[in-house]
Amino acid sequence: MLVVSSVDLYPGSQEERLPGFTPQFPHLVSCSILDRYPQHTVPWHWHRSVELFYIKSGALIYYTPGGQRLFRAGSGGLVNSNVLHRTRAVETGAESIQYVHLFEPELVTGVSGGVIEQRYVAPLLKARGLELIGLSPEDPVQAETLALLRESYALDETDFGYELELQAVLCRIWAGLARQVQAQLGQTPPAVETASEKIKPMMLYIHAHLAEKLSVEQLAAAVFCSEREYYRTFRACLHTTPGEYIRNVRLQTACKLLRETELAVTEVARRCGLGSSSYFGAQFRQEFGCTPTEYRLKWQNSDIGWQENDSGIPAARGTIMA
């Protein structure tokens, strides 16, 4: 199982890049250590793939344009296709560890245009308001779906027949989810553009022009809306202001460049639109409690390999500072 502590996005986009994802078998399983992400947060992003997840330990909050939901250890759920979302670890005294399946809906539809797709898959993908489906261990029916979810993560990827066994259990999980939300299936989105659809080009423009000085007047004009509508869309979808979103994106991008490149701190600051190295350093210290140089050294000096402990949970052989 791939162990991750950062999210990889396509350049100039908030769409997640999925390493190892192939048309022959469009699936990726991973273990996400939320406490080791910058700000203990997976930033806003989306993917066409469906996201099935299980909280192994700790707790985290899923944010979508429709709101937020807390998931504790033993719970799980599904993020629907193309839904904008982010996650943040919650302090519980235990490390926040999440197991994730990312897969294309075709993995469970079978024949294109067939009964399974038309009756169970497409209606769920298109259902109005189904951004996020939660699974609670306290609900007996949902607990059965959670048991299947745990079973899916226990499968050995090296075993002959793994793909067949995984597909079979994913289909059973999907059946459980479809029954759970059956009353909402068949509700299609309205023809008018929703706030969730409006926010994506706004985000894309910010990422494409991150190194520049950005004003709401400029940003609103770029997507042909009023400043008032621009603020309202950010509040409705991301639950924050444009300015705070830009600041967080710049700091997240700076962390990535410090970890993955040898660029000078001044160049990192320039590429992220964070001004002079002194201003960048002050903003970085305020957010992370260390300077950009200290962050880079702590990261580079960390042993970021992983091993599994006796309980089967990935454990760090060193400490990753974030």
Q: What is the role of each PLM region?
A:
Residues G176-A183, P201-L251, R259, L263, ...:
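Basic/polar phosphate-binding segments, predominantly the helix-turn-helix DNA-binding elements
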